């Protein structure tokens, strides 16, 4: 776990720099109107989604560490260029759009590689603990990044945020250069073949696997109907119920707290022996709590429902992520991670808009009940019609480390 701890520390610092820059870009873009702010977000997300499968194939072909080093160096250069351009020409719209497109392209190659790296650094039984530590680090960054970004952009502008981000990417590249990773065995190296065939082979492999297929379907359901609850539906519910903004924030905070409690528990005590069953149970609990949130008569009940929803969310995410990563064939680690990011990103893009529109046209409570019902159907079908409940954590030994 020592090597993993070194990498996770550097990755957390790098992610903090990215969060600071992300807030700075969003703030500057919002100053030019909501339509332009949405265009900047699209410029990041569209190339990321379109190129994810290619990014996974490249990582499986040439190695996740090598891809990450190249991406970190590229982002260091890009951030330095953004800082210099912002100081020279100001915070121009074309500059924001160009930077957003470049970030989206690099992300498409970086995310599958970084997602597969824990499997190369940590043995099977400790994988759930390792991913829980990463989840906690991500929540810490999500909590501290935007306020820090606000301070930076208000006091020094987007150029300072870009310079700080460049420094964190450079740090990440240095850490990766000194990190020893295991050399895959011959049987774990991807076979030769056409590039695009290899890229889409991750989808075929996931669809054919009796554990990966239901795990990814359940992940897509969670992305579509659980992730929008905190960021979209809770604020809408609070406004429609005429609760103060602090109440809506407290409910969202209770959900985050519940998720963190489970992550800490798994980090300290380890994961369940049957992660598939634990993940299904967690999503069932979260769905029930979302239903309770929909009919909550006041803020205290909503707070309790939010906390339980967070506990269920944490139980699901703390077990589904290591199960997917541990079940992936050694030849397809990054490609399966690319598919995992896709099944989280695409449904969320669709349902955020659909659910928001439904809540505007009717009631946030009704939309929350729809989400709860969809989660209930997804978990029940998965529990009854798939092999996921019986799935156990993978326990594959690590190969020897390379110098």
Would you name each region that the model predicts?
Residues 1-403:
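Alpha-helical transmembrane-bundle signature of multi-pass membrane transport and export proteins
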């Amino acid at each position: 776990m020592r090597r993993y701890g070194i990498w996770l520390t550097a990755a957390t610092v790098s992610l903090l720099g990215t969060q600071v820059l992300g807030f700075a870009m969003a703030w500057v873009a919002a100053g030019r109107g909501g339509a332009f702010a949405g265009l900047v977000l699209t410029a990041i997300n569209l190339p990321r989604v379109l190129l994810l499968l290619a990014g996974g194939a490249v990582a499986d072909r040439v190695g996740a560490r090598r891809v990450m080093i190249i991406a970190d160096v590229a982002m260091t250069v890009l951030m330095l260029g953004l800082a210099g351009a912002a100081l020279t020409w100001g915070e121009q719209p074309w500059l924001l759009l160009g930077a957003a497109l470049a970030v989206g392209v690099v992300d498409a190659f970086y995310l599958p590689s970084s997602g597969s790296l824990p499997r190369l650094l940590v043995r099977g039984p400790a994988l759930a603990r390792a991913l829980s530590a990463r989840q906690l680090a991500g929540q810490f960054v999500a909590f501290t990044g935007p306020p820090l970004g606000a301070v930076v952009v208000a006091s020094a502008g987007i150029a300072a945020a870009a310079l700080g981000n460049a420094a964190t990417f450079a740090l990440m590249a240095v850490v990766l250069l000194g990190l020893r990773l295991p050399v895959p065995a011959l049987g774990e190296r991807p076979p030769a073949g056409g590039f695009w065939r290899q890229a889409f082979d991750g989808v075929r492999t996931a669809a054919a696997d009796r554990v990966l297929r239901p795990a990814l379907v359940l992940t897509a359901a969670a992305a579509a109907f659980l992730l929008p609850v905190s960021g979209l539906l809770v604020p809408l519910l609070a406004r429609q119920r005429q609760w103060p903004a602090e109440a809506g924030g407290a409910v969202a905070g209770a959900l985050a707290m519940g998720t963190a409690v489970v992550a800490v528990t798994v980090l300290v005590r380890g994961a369940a022996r049957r992660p598939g069953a634990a993940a299904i149970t967690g999503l069932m609990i979260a769905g029930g709590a979302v239903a309770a949130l929909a009919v909550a008569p006041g803020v205290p009940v909503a707070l309790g429902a939010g906390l339980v929803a967070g506990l269920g969310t944490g139980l699901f995410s703390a077990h589904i992520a290591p199960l997917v990563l541990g079940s992936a064939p050694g030849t397809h680690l990054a490609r399966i991670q690319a598919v995992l990011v896709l099944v989280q990103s695409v449904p969320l893009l669709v349902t955020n808009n659909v659910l928001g529109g439904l809540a505007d046209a009717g009631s946030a409570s009704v939309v929350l009940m729809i989400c709860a019902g969809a989660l209930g159907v997804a978990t029940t079908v998965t529990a009854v019609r798939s092999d996921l409940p019986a799935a156990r954590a993978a326990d594959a030994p690590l190969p020897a480390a390379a110098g």
